[in-house]
Amino acid sequence: MEQNLSNLIRPMSVVAQEAINYISGRRDHSITSLKTRWAKFNKQCMGGIEPNTVYTIAGISGSGKSSFANEISTDIVDLNPGEEMVILIFSLEMVGFRQVGRTLSSKLRKTTSTLYSSETDLDDDTFRKVISVSNQLKEYPIWFVDNPTTPKEAEDIIKYFYNTYIKGTDKHFVIMYDHALLTKPIGSVIETMQELERVFISAKKYPMTSVLQLAQMNRNIESPERINNPLSHYPMRSDISSADALFQASDYVIVIHRPEILGIQEYGPSHLPTQNKVYLHILKNRDAGKPCILEFQNDLAYNNLIES
């Protein structure tokens, strides 16, 4: 027992050297964040998706949070050609092939409605492009988990992937979890969320590992009192379901919001425009970055956001 406990204790000399190694690695670019397509987002988040970090991305239904996360999953492959990685996506809200459908929508500039022949059959030329891009996507180092798991099952899957594909290499390990409230319960919602966040805190301590989890907003932000008061338009910590557990575990807490879908024409005390706009609020930045708002043009018809 004493020997096991001693493995949990490390002297300052070891931890300080780890800090030196990390700063040195960032300085000589042997350790890098994974860039996304959004320069302002990258700037606020230490260059992109940073190792040993938990990101929480929250929003109401229809806000674009899943599309935002989906773009990140392919961006980090496309925009970081010198980096090796493994991406594990827990796609609990939709089956994996529909996630790929969203990626095809973005890359081909076709709506998913068009790709799925909802009104007219997809034309031959576009279908050939679907096949071509899909064959490229088959080479991406991405794996999917479609079925909801308990926190312990998620932890076992993460450990398996780390030991099988990451351990002993310099690869990035990116875990994406869509989304937290769809976790198979082990008790109350609060108990389940607390255990899930324990899993993510543990996982981010693996070398070169990042966790991105999606979360749901509660209904508070949709109340008439909030909608009719510009001072109350912006999302707050209390608007996120299971906020205490998520905030404690997260290095970044990000809320994606489309005030337009709530009927708001001028957003917040600064009267920001809402037509075809999506706003990204960074509510928490553990590295002391100030809370900020990033503006995007709504391109969600093609499962994309365009940084303004």
Residue ranges: model-predicted function:
Residues 2-110:
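The Walker A/P-loop phosphate-binding site
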Residues 6-17, 109, 113-120, 125, ...:
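C-terminal regions of RecA-like/P-loop NTPase motor modules
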Residues 55-57, 88-90, 143-145, 212, ...:
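Hydrophobic/aromatic beta-strand patches that form the interior of the parallel beta-sheet core
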Residues 72, 98-103, 157-160, 195, ...:
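Alpha-helical scaffold elements adjacent to nucleotide-binding pockets in ATP/GTP-utilizing enzyme cores
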Residues 141-205:
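Phosphate-binding/switch loop-helix module in NTP-utilizing enzymes
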Residues 176, 209-216:
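Structural recognition of the conserved hydrophobic beta-strand(s) that form the central parallel beta-sheet
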